[in-house]
Each structure stands twice: as C-alpha cells, then as structure tokens.
Amino acid sequence: MLPAQKHTLETLLENSVKQVVQASKGDADAAFVLPAIALERPKVAAHGDVACNVALQLAKPLGANPRQLAEQIVAALTAQPEAAGLVDAAEIAGPGFINLRLTPASKQAVIGAVLAQGRAFGASERDHDKRVLLEFVSANPTGPLHVGHGRQAALGDALANVLASQGYAVHREFYYNDAGVQIGNLAISTQARARGLKPGDAGWPEAAYNGEYIADIARDYLNGETVAASDGEPVTGKRDVEDLEAIRKFAVTYLRREQDMDLKAFGVKFDQYYLESSLYTEGRVEKTVDALIAAGMTYEQEGALWLRTTDEGDDKDRVMRKTDGTYTYFVPDVAYHVTKWERGFTKVINIQGSDHHGTIARVRAGLQGLHIGIPKGYPDYVLHKMVTVMRDGQEVKISKRAGSYVTVRDLIEWSGGATPGSEGSPELLDEATITRGRDAVRFFLISRKADTEFVFDIDLALKQNDENPVYYVQYAHARICSVINEWKSRYGATDALLPGADLSPLDSKQAMALMQKLAEYPDVLAHAAGELAPHAVAFYLRELASEFHSFYNAERVLVDEQAPRTARVALLAATRQVLENGLAMLGVSAPSKM
C-alpha cells in the first residue's frame, strides 16, 4: 500500500472508531483517548492485505466484546464513500482482528506512481529540515583498509543514501587517528625498514608493524617519491633515515593516499576528513579537559586524572590523563564530538566495530559532564561485528601481528573474478572486473544486520545463479530490460504508452503480489532510516526479485493481445525502476545486460 493510501485508510478507520466510541460512551467521557491505528501486513496472504487490531485495544476500556466492536467498526468503515476505492472486502477473524482486502485498482495504482516519480519513488521530505553527521570508516592511517573497514564503508555509505532519501542533509565524515602511539609505531616501523631491517632481525622494534606494505613505504621514502592524500599537501620523501618526523609525515600521507584509492575503488566519498592531530594543535583537547575539571567531573588519584564516568552509568571511573602526562584514547574523542556539536550537528551517528562498545559510555559521560546542552544518548552508534572471509572453501587466515590482512582491495578483486597475475595490480584490472567486485562486496556486506557476524564467501560471490543474492537481484533488472527492449523492437512501442496503460488485466495472484511488494518500498526506506538499518533495503530487493521471478514464470509478458501485453510491460517497467532505485541506495549498479 502506498503511503498516501495508508494515510487515507488510517483516517477512515479512525473516523470509524470515533463513531463506535461515540455510540458506546456518548459525551460522558470527553477525556477518552483513542488508540492509535496500526496497520500491518498479515503473515498469511489468505488473511487479506491489511490487518488491524484496534477492536482488541478498545474492548477493555469500553467493556465490550471485541468481535462485536470489530463488526461495528467495519460497518462504519464501509459506510464511508471514500472507502469504496480502497477496500474491496472486510472480514473479522479470531477474537476481533479486522482483515481488509484492497481493491485491484488501489494495488495497481503503484505502477502509475512509480512511472511518474522515477528515481524519486520511495523518497520523502519527512526530515527535510534536519542535518546529520555520519562518521564511518575512520581507520588509523597505519595500514591498508581491511575487510572490517569495508563493512563500515558499505554500511555507512548505504545509510547515508537512505537518510538522504528521507530528506536529511547528510554530512559524511572520516576521522583520521593520526596522533598517538600507533602513529609513532608506524614511524619506527618505516624507519627500521629504511635501515634494511625486517621482522625477526636483531634490532627490529618490538612494537613495529610487520606487514610488507611497510617495506613499500620505506622504499618510496628512500627513493624521494612524492605522495599526497586527497585533502592534503604533497609530501616528498627526504631519504634521511634519521629524520623520524619526516618519516612519520611521509608514512601517514602514503597510507592515507592508499586508503583514498581503496575508497575510490569502493565508490565511497566523504565530505570531510577530520584529523585527530588538529585537536591537539588547535588546543581543543586541553580546552575540553580544563572544562571537565572546572565542572567538577574529574579527580586526581595516584598521579592520574580520572573522569567520573560512573555518574553517567559507566561501570567504573576512567583515567583521562596518565601519570606520564599523556591522554587516554577516549579523551580526544570527547573533544572531537564537541566539535561536531559546535558545528551544528544535533544528530550524529557513528558506525564503528563492536570492539568500540566500551568507549560509548566514556564519550557520552565526557559530553554530559561539559554541561553545554548536548542531550543524553549523543551520539548514536551503529556497531558492527566481525567479517570472516572464505575462499576455495577455506577460511582466509589473518594475523594482525604478522601484518597479514584481507583488504578491501583484495575483496573487490577476488569477488570480481580477477585473473591470476592481475591481483594486487589495479592498473591491470578492467572496469568490468572492478564494478562486478565492488557490487558483490557492497551488497554482501550490507545484506546482514550490522550486529551479526558475517561470513563473506568469495566462491558464492563468483556464482552466476540465484544462490548469489546480488546476481539474483541484478539479473531480475537485466531480464526486465531485455523484455522491454524486445517489446519495443517487436511492436514498435515506446515508453510513452506505459503511464496511461489500462492496468485492469493485472489481476492474477502473482501480479497482485508483485504490485504490493512495489508499494512497500517507501515504507522500507522510512524504516531503514528510522532504525539505522540499511540491510532492510537489501532484504527487500531480494524479496522484490523473488516476486518478479514468480510473476515472470507464471505469465507470458509479450502476448498477442495488446491490452494485457502493455499492462504487463508497465508492471515490469515499474519493477525495473524500483530495483534500480534500491540498488542505488546500496551503491550497487543496475546492469541492463548480464
């Protein structure tokens, strides 16, 4: 049911309930509160198209039999002239459930709506006056983007698209942790490689990163190469193995450039890159700490500065400033979120790995302790669990200590079917391979709830059958394109015939089910935005593709008779549009041929 139809039906039912309550109570209780009208899709198709339990809700306060109340509500509903265009039949089930069957014309109306609105179908201006800052990926510039970052990138970009579809002004932000111990470890790792050392050698730093990518950084530094991140100034290797600060700057910029390349291949763009180091250079960390001290939110103990996080529900107070004068990692996070608030973002969503769960209470406690008007529960979080990668039936082993990762680039190349010899060499990959891999990786990583662990099966991503969910959805789109092209070629038809087509021939069970599924799309987007759940769009697309295949297998589209032929093509055109719209939300292509 389309949103406008749903609103109309809710209003009609509300009017009906008012009549029944008025008849039962008269004006004796003006304060009586009517229950909200909740419409649901019955779990069993045979029970109708829409179910409502309002009679059960009214039974106790009115002291009446719920089934009799349901009969009275239905009578009042069907007596309203406006209901005739929506409600075909009404039935009472069980103790008092109201099951409604919608008219064929009301179901067919979705086709005209989709064809008229095109890419805008499903979008809403419900939240047009709201701004939201969405922070995701936010990887340390100490190594390549791995599969966990890939899940964040896919979830974050899709959620940004979904929120934008509901009218939000979305600001995509990447927070670079370019300060602290890990950056120091990156610098000494690169310096050791530049000196000719490798993991296991005498003199290799214990805290160093062991990955081979460190050797690549050291090589380019010694060769005097110039590197630049997308938002920064170029940095040239000084070739001086003793200048640790020069090595640090080069290594950070080198890895930021590599991450930029990975994000570009993945189709993810950011509005802003925010550097942790700027919080220190601008004095924001010190200012935040001073404000918390002034607010009485801290205390000194054993030479360290503690934050009273238990005041805000944490299980124990947390150290802010260690005995050596350095800050613990959550302190700059508090300062960073103050900047988000000061920039006018009253709604902030962070997408992070589930290992960040422990920092939530600390960051929120710090923000509350500042007493600057930030609401409790700020910011919102979407936490995702781990991704395990399977290839050739075996788990791909990773070792953080050894510096071995499954990178985003690996996933794209493997899932795209990169030929042996081209893996690890982007310049050797054709655009089709990159697109195929990107589509598979994005769809797969979005296709499960964020808080569930996910097994990414490369072998499944390469399959070209209905076992592969992204292939299944994309194939539905491509099949429709093929049928419509054949329709135009064989009958000399054009798209102009479709908006005004007679849709009455679309009366089969399969056609009705497909049209109802199309009409659900706006609600799916609204739900995905409200629950911060982009996986709902992936679920929906698989269901829509399934309904299309059921219809296509049950009914010939290009029949001899013009009226049913044009009606069925119109249904296919609407289905194609919604598939395209949904895939676009996920950042996945909608191919016309496969």
Curated annotation (Swiss-Prot):
<dbReference type="GO" id="GO:0005737">
    <property type="term" value="C:cytoplasm"/>
</dbReference>
<dbReference type="InterPro" id="IPR001412">
    <property type="entry name" value="aa-tRNA-synth_I_CS"/>
</dbReference>
<dbReference type="GO" id="GO:0005524">
    <property type="term" value="F:ATP binding"/>
</dbReference>
<keyword id="KW-0963">Cytoplasm</keyword>
<keyword id="KW-0030">Aminoacyl-tRNA synthetase</keyword>
<dbReference type="InterPro" id="IPR001278">
    <property type="entry name" value="Arg-tRNA-ligase"/>
</dbReference>
<dbReference type="InterPro" id="IPR036695">
    <property type="entry name" value="Arg-tRNA-synth_N_sf"/>
</dbReference>
<keyword id="KW-0436">Ligase</keyword>
<dbReference type="InterPro" id="IPR035684">
    <property type="entry name" value="ArgRS_core"/>
</dbReference>
<dbReference type="InterPro" id="IPR009080">
    <property type="entry name" value="tRNAsynth_Ia_anticodon-bd"/>
</dbReference>
<feature type="short sequence motif" description="'HIGH' region">
    <location>
        <begin position="139"/>
        <end position="149"/>
    </location>
</feature>
<comment type="similarity">
    <text>Belongs to the class-I aminoacyl-tRNA synthetase family.</text>
</comment>
<dbReference type="Pfam" id="PF03485">
    <property type="entry name" value="Arg_tRNA_synt_N"/>
</dbReference>
<keyword id="KW-0648">Protein biosynthesis</keyword>
<dbReference type="GO" id="GO:0004814">
    <property type="term" value="F:arginine-tRNA ligase activity"/>
</dbReference>
<keyword id="KW-0067">ATP-binding</keyword>
<dbReference type="InterPro" id="IPR014729">
    <property type="entry name" value="Rossmann-like_a/b/a_fold"/>
</dbReference>
<dbReference type="InterPro" id="IPR008909">
    <property type="entry name" value="DALR_anticod-bd"/>
</dbReference>
<keyword id="KW-0547">Nucleotide-binding</keyword>
<dbReference type="InterPro" id="IPR005148">
    <property type="entry name" value="Arg-tRNA-synth_N"/>
</dbReference>
<protein>
    <recommendedName>
        <fullName>Arginine--tRNA ligase</fullName>
        <ecNumber>6.1.1.19</ecNumber>
    </recommendedName>
</protein>
<dbReference type="Pfam" id="PF00750">
    <property type="entry name" value="tRNA-synt_1d"/>
</dbReference>
<dbReference type="Pfam" id="PF05746">
    <property type="entry name" value="DALR_1"/>
</dbReference>
<comment type="subunit">
    <text>Monomer.</text>
</comment>
<dbReference type="GO" id="GO:0006420">
    <property type="term" value="P:arginyl-tRNA aminoacylation"/>
</dbReference>
